[in-house]
Amino acid sequence: MASHNASQTTKAIVAKCLASVRAHPAFDGLVSEVNGAVAVNNIVPSFSGPTEGWVGYHNKMAGYAHSANALRAVYETCVKLGVKFALGSDRGEVTRLVYASSPPSKECVGVETRRGEIYRAKRVILALGAAVGALLPQIGSQITGRCWGIVHIQLTPKEAEELRGIPVTNVLDLAFFFEPDKTTNKLKFCHMGGGFTNFAGSRDGLSLPYPRLADSDFVPLEDDTYIRRLLREALPQFAERPLIDAHLCWFADTADSDYISDYVPGTDSSLVVLSGDSGHGFKMLPILGDFVVDLLTCGSQDNSKWRWKEACMVKEPNAWRGETATQELAGIPRSRS
């Protein structure tokens, strides 16, 4: 969707997305154009705000993934299958890759953790999201660590029930949200846009997440502004409610929003990198493992889009996120909500 105040560029992006899904036979009869408040209210009667001038489309096949529950289910299944996890800041935090000592070989033979413990392996797989450059600086021309701000508002059980089952609502120039969490009754919001980088203090000229999780417990002030504007448009009764549980959500961004799933060149096929989620990769969780198995079985990446690429520094994000430019986190005003 685009709000009535959205630029023509943003509205054109939404129209392009609509044309794309309409052209795919899988969406036949499941996508409808939305133009104005009456159309919005017909789809989501629980929106009490004006939504005047909203334009876009309703895709009945769209949805969301509950990331916390999904990851918990994967973890529990892995444990049952015998996978061993080394967790915690000492046992689980990897500080460097370990390579064979005999040059000129660059064979990766394991990893070392913060407390000095070395885990050895015939093949090492790096799946570190936005932090991948900390262990593999040479990927910096392909991956930029970016983040968006995430906030929540607390609803009562009655308020949450009234919004149960609403469609994922993404107003491209404002923010997106979806139905409240069934356990906490919290409503989650994210203003996407161009995102934010953290190049400050990087020794290798890379944008990386803050080293401590607690350092990311805030959102930029502009996110607060966009989210409250969306609330006034859709759910004005919550527009002044405190924004809680604020944090930055980091992702590994590529120039084309495609993954990097390949062997790292020059490592004798001993090191594999899985990265480039680009802020939209989690929906692939149920099938991503199959792609990795194919890579390990074949010994090379057949999909050219997912190969290791040289000299393709990510500058600005793709248009599907809107037209706002990326900003550097250092020095930006922070929300106090």
Spans of features found by a protein language model:
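A conserved short coil-to-beta-strand element within the FAD-binding core of flavoproteins
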Residues: A86-V109
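Short, hydrophobic/aromatic-rich segments at coil-to-beta transitions
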Residues: K106-V111, R164-V168
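Active-site substrate-recognition segment that forms the wall
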Residues: Y119-R123, L128-S269
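General small-molecule cofactor/ligand-binding pocket signal
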Residues: S32-N35, K84-G88, P242-D245
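C-terminal catalytic lobe of FAD-dependent flavoproteins
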Residues: Y226-S337
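A general structural signal for well-ordered alpha-helical segments in protein cores
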Residues: K11-L18, A37, L71, D224-R228, ...
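Short beta-strand to alpha-helix junction loop
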Residues: N5-A12, Y57-T77, D215-D223
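Dinucleotide-binding Rossmann-like beta1-alpha1 core, especially the glycine-rich loop
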Residues: M1-I43, G53
